[in-house]
Each structure stands twice: as structure tokens, then as C-alpha cells.
Amino acid sequence: MSVIKMTDLDLAGKRVFIRADLNVPVKDGKVTSDARIRASLPTIELALKQGAKVMVTSHLGRPTEGEYNEEFSLLPVVNYLKDKLSNPVRLVKDYLDGVDVAEGELVVLENVRFNKGEKKDDEILSKKYAALCDVFVMDAFGTAHRAQASTHGIGKFADVACAGPLLAAELDALGKALKEPARPMVAIVGGSKVSTKLTVLDSLSKIADQLIVGGGIANTFIAAQGHDVGKSLYEADLVDEAKRLLTTCNIPVPSDVRVATEFSETAPATLKSVNDVKADEQILDIGDASAQELAEILKNAKTILWNGPVGVFEFPNFRKGTEIVANAIADSEAFSIAGGGDTLAAIDLFGIADKISYISTGGGAFLEFVEGKVLPAVAMLEERAKK
């Protein structure tokens, strides 16, 4: 993957426009989870250290496009950055007709979704963004799968368009896991629906030596083996698809499960064989024997790609399966890459972040990359690198 990297450029005195992913949860004007800002900080600090005139922007939430809405302002992000940086930081609300930035200063440009035409990759808006800078840095892997004015359009018109350190690291890590993985390669795909992950399952079935399924997805595979899944979340119309995948790839289907009669945090868990699930029960986690089987597979892996929990880990009674799998990944000597919101929440819950080789910041972008789809922002950077 050939792109210009920000780390290869001399940014001194240059106007640098960084498109970061600062889309963080905010409550009462305060950032409640700073993971994405922390991930973006090294890029911002590097540009400032080089003496660049630094602008950074992002989307935040889903405001009505083209309208300012205080609820979706980047002000809480600015206040967070002021605490973390020794450099001056200020928020600029109206910037499309130009903005003055001093060397060593950080200017945060207000939420890009307040600009009409952002989501449609409007050419006029893209050119206005490009006119603000000498160097455009795309560093938001989480939005690289969307062709929008601040992630894609600007890069076509800026003097220089490059990949920031965070984006470059994402592409390197995913490339390492998917293009030439050390084997055996094990992929874990959890989540509630086969339909939303079908292309991912299909792509990984061709790459992985073993494909582990979890959550509602696993229930569809359990049904495909002829077992009754009771009231469990599963997709009857995709049972044949699950049967097909079972013939093309090595997929260990759970042999025992934890069930409950209601979907509730306080519902007691009953451990039983998949042969014994009753009509009024729902499967909410894999059982101990199944979890240990997966742990053994993961122990011998050389590459692990993890997307999604294997049970409803948010409920303490149905956490054990995901915890065993998570700890097996953490203890493995394999190159491990994890992505997706629920996966990151599980990593935080079990405190294993420092034991995962690479944690992806992208949700949809992570999945689309795994599917083998072209990410518009990355394609644009590759195109610009040729010129």
C-alpha cells in the first residue's frame, strides 16, 4: 500500500490540516471516553513539535448537516486538549473563508458536519477545506470508508495529501494480519447477526485456518447443525448459508452453552449441552467446555483477528465465555489485532489492552477492510502518492 506518510514530510512553517477521529461520547459538556483523542494526540503533537501551523477537525455525533448545534460542538474536545497540551489551543467556528494559525498553535476547526455538503463529498466544500492548508493529513481510520469532503474530497485538491501516523499504523497492522498472516491464523467474529457480518465471514473463511463464531451469529450455526435454539436470537433464513460456511472452513460450533429464560442482567445462567436447549430458553453465552476448546485453538495461533464478543458479556452471568477467550488472546504469543466497539469494550472490561498487539480505532472501516473493500480515503491517498 503506497501512500505518502506524514512522518516523511518536513512540516515546519506549513499550514497542516489534520482530519482526526475525535468523535467521542460527551455528557454534560465533558468527554466521557477519551480513547479516540488519546489515539490522535501523537499525530497532533508531532506536527506541533515540527513548528507547523496546525488545524485539526473531526465530526462529532449526528447533527443536522449545515446547522450549528451546540450539543455537537467540539468544545469539550478543545477543553480536553487544553489540559493535555502545553501549546495554545482554540476553537474556530467559522473557517471556510480562511483562518489564521500561528506556528506552534493548535486550532480546532468546528464539527465538519455543521458544513453543508460534508457527507456528500461536495467539491466546492472540499476545495474550501483544501485552500486552508499546504498539507492535508488523513488520520481518521474510523471514517476512511466514507467518501466525505473532509476525509476524501479535500485530499484531491490539497497541495499534498498524506496518511497520518495513526492511519498508517492501522493499514500496516491490518495488512500484516490479512495479506500475509503467520499461520495458523484464527479469526473470531461475534455479534448479533450473521446478515451484518456475512461478507466478513465469507472473506475470512478464505483466509483463516480457523473461524470462530460467537454471540447471535453462533446461534445460527448451532441451528445449522440441527439443534433447537429455543428463543435465542438467530436468523432462520441464513441457516443454509451457515451450513455452506461449515463445509468450506473449519468452524468450531459450541457444544455447551449458558441459557436463561429472559434477556436480563439479573437472569440466572444455566449451563447445558446444546442438545438440551428448551423452547423457552435463549442462549446468551458459550459454555465452559466450548470456551476451553477455543482457548486451546487460540493458544496455538500465530495470527489472531478479533471482532466481536462470544456472549452477552455486559451481563455478569454471561461474561465467562468472552472472558476466557479474551484472556486466551492476551496470553497468546500470536500477532493479535482487535476491532469494533463491543470488542474494545470487552478489552477495557478485562484490562488486557496492553496484551493485544494492535487495537483498531475503526468500526465500519475495520470491517470493510477485512471484507477486502476499497476504502475511499485510502484509495485517494494512493492516487495522490502517484503524482
UniProtKB/Swiss-Prot annotation:
Subcellular location field: Cytoplasm
EC number of the protein: 2.7.2.3
Gene3D superfamilies the UniProt entry points to: Phosphoglycerate kinase, N-terminal domain
Keywords, comma-separated and alphabetical: Acetylation, ATP-binding, Cytoplasm, Glycolysis, Kinase, Nucleotide-binding, Transferase
Residues carrying N6-acetyllysine: 84
One record GO biological process: gluconeogenesis
The keyword Cytoplasm appears for this protein: yes
GO cellular component: cytosol
Top-rank lineage group of the source organism: Bacteria
Binding site for substrate: 21-23, 36, 59-62, 113, 146
GO MF term list: ADP binding; ATP binding; phosphoglycerate kinase activity
Annotated binding of ATP, by residue: 197, 314, 340-343
Catalytic activity line of the entry: (2R)-3-phosphoglycerate + ATP = (2R)-3-phospho-glyceroyl phosphate + ADP
Biological pathway: Carbohydrate degradation; glycolysis; pyruvate from D-glyceraldehyde 3-phosphate: step 2/5
Class in the EC hierarchy, top level: transferase
Summary of subunit composition and partner proteins: Monomer.
Name recorded for this polypeptide: Phosphoglycerate kinase
The organism of origin for this protein: Escherichia coli O157:H7
